[in-house]
UniProtKB/Swiss-Prot annotation:
It comes from Homo sapiens. One of its GO terms (molecular function) is GTPase activity. InterPro entries: Dynamin, GED, GED_dom. Residues 32-102 form the GED domain. This is Putative GED domain-containing protein DNM1P34. The gene is DNM1P34. It comes from the Eukaryota.
Amino acid sequence: MPSCSPQQASKAEENGSNSFMHSMVPQLEWQMETTQSLVDSYVAIVNKTVWDLMVGLTPKTIMHLMINNNKEFIFSELLANLYLHGDKNMLMEESAEQAQRS
């Protein structure tokens, strides 16, 4: 069995660990790329969700409130006032323009 000096043994260990690390580099790079891709996707989802909540949802909410308020006004006050102050027969008559179309 050949004997080797401690320096040679340490060099052999370094070479062995270097070859081990060299074989691990592609796997580590793949893991880093995968992790980076997952983080990018997560950040994009969070940004879209925040945008939808802050910017995208506000106009929708305003339109919803406006439409609901108008609908409530029409059903509660407008129709009641029309029936109260107007001639019901006149309200139900077909306009001349509509009669010509028929």
